[in-house]
């Protein structure tokens, strides 16, 4: 990895699949979609600390209620951004040598009002960079971005049989 790289686009959603006014068949479901990034550190000697800069121009990213998690050892640890503005939200993660971590960014579905409103739609792109560009500036990393989503049926509060999707994203390196 160079000191900084664009990885992929992202789209975070809590939205109806079909707009209610157009749902003449009554098939409308709500999708909750998050962004998942697997990061493998292929280096045998050193951990790498990265900054993940999520950039969104048309939507105020800091005004959206989001959750971020980092998982290397089976514990989804809640992350807070190290920087947040209207157009950027930056997280910092460390991947041990020869290990893989999973970063998750999703709408805050722990807040029922977010799911009930079904009005979250945030798009942008991710730029990764070394947290400290001094010292070793060349790391062999494997980045695998994807979207994962859950479809909630109508009346989801009483009938929790959902379907899920997983889609790999094109990445730039």
Regions found by a protein language model. Give the residues of each.
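Conserved long hydrophobic alpha-helices within structured protein cores
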Residues: 1-15, 47-56, 62-68, 98
């Amino acid at each position: 990895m160079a000191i900084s790289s664009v990885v992929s686009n992202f789209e975070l959603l809590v939205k109806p699949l079909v707009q209610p006014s157009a749902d003449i068949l009554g098939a409308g479901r709500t999708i909750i979609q998050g962004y998942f990034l697997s990061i493998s550190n292929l280096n045998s000697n050193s951990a790498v600390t990265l900054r993940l800069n999520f950039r969104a121009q048309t939507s105020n990213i800091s005004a959206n209620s989001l959750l971020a998690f980092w998982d290397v050892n089976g514990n989804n640890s809640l992350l807070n951004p190290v920087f947040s503005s209207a157009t950027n939200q930056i997280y910092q993660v460390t991947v041990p040598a020869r290990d893989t971590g999973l970063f998750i960014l999703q709408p805050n579905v722990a807040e029922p009002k977010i799911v009930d409103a079904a009005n979250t739609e945030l798009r942008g792109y991710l730029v990764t960079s070394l947290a400290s560009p001094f010292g070793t500036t060349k790391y062999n990393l494997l980045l695998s971005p994807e979207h994962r989503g859950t479809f909630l049926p109508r009346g989801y509060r009483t009938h929790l049989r959902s379907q899920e999707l997983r889609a790999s994203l094109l990445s730039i390196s």
